[in-house]
Regions:
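Active-site-proximal substrate-binding groove within the catalytic cores of carbohydrate-active enzymes
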Residues: 60-86
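Extended glycan-interaction surfaces of carbohydrate-active proteins
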Residues: 1-64, 88-143
Length: 143
């Protein structure tokens, strides 16, 4: 959140470190396989027992599309060429799933929607921040 929100909501001007913030997130592994994660690696010790049992790593390496959409829009402002593959990856997920999911499993190469351990949880869909992604898609139509 702290990486993207100040710039996205224009609390901090881009000139005061947008490029550096985006690069730091990428170097830290928060933007791979797709932005944006809370952590590059899971730290189970930080999860309470209920979280470990039902939704492990939910706020760890999972890819959060709300933050990812903000990261993408900022990247489009800072470095349009670097944003293109991220935009296309998000576009592919939306086309594949037919919706914007809240969270993807960051440990899965194919970026499947996040599921809890017992099959009683599936990442929400049709998220409102999909409009942030839609703006990016509209500005850069697919190939």
């Amino acid at each position: 959140d702290a990486t993207v929100a100040p710039f996205f909501f224009e609390v901090v001007p881009d000139e005061l470190g947008l490029r550096a913030a985006l690069e730091a997130a990428k170097r830290a592994g928060l933007a791979d396989p797709l932005p944006l994660r809370y952590a590059a690696t899971r730290d189970a010790a930080k999860e309470d027992r209920m979280t470990q049992r039902f939704v492990p790593d939910y706020q760890g390496t999972a890819v959060w599309t709300s933050l990812g959409a903000m990261y993408l829009r900022l990247l489009q402002r800072a470095d349009p060429d670097a944003a293109r593959p991220v935009l296309e990856a998000y576009r592919a997920l939306v086309e594949r799933d037919g919706t914007v999911r809240e969270v993807y499993d960051g440990n899965e190469v194919s970026l499947v929607p996040y599921r809890g351990t017992l099959g009683i949880f599936l990442a929400d869909e049709a998220m409102l921040w999909g409009t942030i992604l839609a703006e990016g898609f509209e500005e850069h139509p697919g190939s």
